[in-house]
C-alpha cells in the first residue's frame, strides 16, 4: 500500500470518515467538533461544518439517496444533526434528540428512509426521515444490548442492520410488524466489539465481519446458505432468540495481524477486508477460498505513533482516520 494523500486540517483526533456512494465527496469528523468535506477528484476542501455540536463529532454518514447530498453527524453531546446542500450552500437541516449519553454511531438504510443511531446509553434508535430531511420520527428504541453500543451498520442493499457493543456481542436487526427486533445475537468475541461491516454483495449470501478489543476479526455467515466448507464442526452457532430469529455461524477468523484492539473494519465490493486499530497498523485481507483468508498487505504506523480509529473503502483506495488528526488516503 502507498500513501497518496494526507488530509490535514482537524485540530483534534480524526474519528471517522464517510464516502458518498454516488458523488465524489468524503466527509471526516473530529474531536475538534467539526466535519470537513472534500472533493475526492482533487482532494480540495469543499466546506467545513463548524456548528451544531459542542462536543466531539464521533460519527458521520452520507445519506445514500436524495436529489442533493445530505449527511448525519453523531456527537458526544448526545445529539445527531442532519446537514445538506441546498442552493450551493451547506445548511443545518435538523437536530435529533433522544439519547441520554454520547452518540457513538450513525448509519442510513440502503434506501435512505431510515437512520439508526447508537449510544453509550446502551440503546439503538431507529428514525424515519421525511423527504426533506427536516423531520425525523423515532419508530423504534432497541435496548437488548447490556452495555455501551459502539457501532451500527446497515447492509448496503438489504433492510437489515448490525450493532456492535461493549457487551462483547454483535446483534442483527430486522423489521417485524412495524417494529424492529433482534434476529441474531453473535457471541464469539471475548471483549468489546468495536465495529462491524457487511459484505456488499447482492443475493442470498449474507456475511458480516466484526472486530474486537480481543485483537480478532470474525467473519460471520448466515446459516442455511450455499457455500462454505460444509463442515461446521467446532463452529458454534450464534444464540437464537425467538422463532423469527436467524442462525449465523462463525465462518472464519481472519489471520492474526494486530497486537492491540481492532477499532474498525471495512469490506469492499472486490471482496477485500481492511482493518485498523490501536497498534497503528492498516491491514488488508483477501479470501482465497470460502472462509480461507490471508493477509494481502499491511502498513505499520499508518499514522506514525498514533492510534487509527477508522477505515473505509473509497473504491479500491482506503481512507484512515487517526489520533494525529490526519485523514490518510492509501492506494492498495
Curated annotation (Swiss-Prot):
Organism superkingdom: Eukaryota
Signal peptide: none
InterPro entries to which the protein is assigned, alphabetical: CIAO1/Cia1, G-protein_beta_WD-40_rep, WD40/YVTN_repeat-like_dom_sf, WD40_repeat_CS, WD40_repeat_dom_sf, WD40_rpt
Keywords: Cytoplasm, Nucleus, Repeat, WD repeat
Compartmental location: Cytoplasm; Nucleus
Positions of WD repeats: 9-48, 52-93, 98-137, 144-183, 188-230, 257-295, 302-332
GO biological process: iron-sulfur cluster assembly
Gene Ontology cellular-component annotations: cytosolic [4Fe-4S] assembly targeting complex; nucleus
Pfam families: WD40
Entries under HAMAP family matching the protein: ciao1 (MF_03037)
Assembly description: Interacts with NAR1.
Matching PANTHER family: CYTOSOLIC IRON-SULFUR PROTEIN ASSEMBLY PROTEIN CIAO1-RELATED, WD40 PROTEIN CIAO1
Role, per record: Essential component of the cytosolic iron-sulfur (Fe/S) protein assembly machinery. Required for the maturation of extramitochondrial Fe/S proteins.
Annotated family: Belongs to the WD repeat CIA1 family.
Protein name according to UniProt: Probable cytosolic iron-sulfur protein assembly protein 1
Organism, as annotated: Yarrowia lipolytica (strain CLIB 122 / E 150)
Phylogenetic placement of the source organism: Eukaryota, Fungi, Dikarya, Ascomycota, Saccharomycotina
Amino acid at each position: 500500500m502507498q500513501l497518496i494523500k494526507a488530509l490535514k486540517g482537524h485540530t483534534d483526533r480524526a474519528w471517522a470518515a464517510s464516502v458518498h456512494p454516488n458523488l465524489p465527496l468524503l466527509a471526516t469528523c473530529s474531536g475538534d467538533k467539526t466535519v470537513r468535506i472534500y472533493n475526492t477528484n482533487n482532494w480540495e476542501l469543499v466546506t467545513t461544518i463548524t456548528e451544531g455540536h459542542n462536543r466531539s463529532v464521533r460519527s458521520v454518514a452520507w445519506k445514500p439517496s436524495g436529489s442533493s447530498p445530505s449527511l448525519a453527524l453523531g456527537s458526544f453531546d448526545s445529539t445527531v444533526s442532519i446537514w445538506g446542500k441546498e442552493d450551493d450552500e451547506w445548511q443545518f437541516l435538523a437536530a435529533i434528540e433522544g439519547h441520554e449519553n454520547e452518540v457513538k454511531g450513525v448509519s442510513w438504510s440502503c434506501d435512505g428512509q431510515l437512520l439508526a443511531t447508537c449510544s453509550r446509553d446502551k440503546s439503538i434508535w431507529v428514525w424515519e426521515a421525511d423527504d426533506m430531511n427536516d423531520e425525523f420520527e423515532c419508530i423504534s428504541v432497541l435496548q437488548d444490548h447490556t452495555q455501551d453500543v459502539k457501532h451500527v451498520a446497515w447492509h448496503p442493499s438489504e433492510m437489515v442492520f448490525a450493532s456492535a457493543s461493549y457487551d462483547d456481542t454483535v446483534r442483527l436487526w430486522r423489521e417485524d410488524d412495524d417494529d424492529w427486533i433482534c434476529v441474531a445475537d453473535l457471541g464469539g468475541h471475548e471483549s468489546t466489539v468495536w465495529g462491524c461491516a457487511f459484505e456488499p454483495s447482492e443475493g442470498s449470501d449474507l456475511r458480516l465481519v466484526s472486530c474486537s478489543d480481543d485483537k480478532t476479526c470474525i467473519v460471520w455467515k448466515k446459516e442455511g446458505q450455499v457455500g462454505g466448507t460444509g463442515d461446521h464442526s467446532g463452529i458454534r452457532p450464534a444464540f437464537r432468540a425467538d422463532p423469527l430469529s436467524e442462525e449465523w455461524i462463525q465462518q472464519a477468523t481472519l489471520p492474526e495481524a494486530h497486537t492491540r484492539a481492532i477499532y474498525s473494519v471495512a469490506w469492499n465490493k472486490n471482496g477485500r477486508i481492511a482493518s485498523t486499530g490501536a497498534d497503528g497498523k492498516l491491514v488488508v485481507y483477501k479470501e482465497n477460498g470460502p472462509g480461507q483468508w490471508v493477509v494481502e498487505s499491511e502498513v505499520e504506523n499508518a499514522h506514525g505513533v498514533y492510534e487509527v480509529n477508522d477505515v473505509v473503502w473509497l473504491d479500491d483506495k482506503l481512507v484512515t482516520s487517526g489520533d494525529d488528526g490526519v485523514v490518510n488516503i492509501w492506494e492498495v
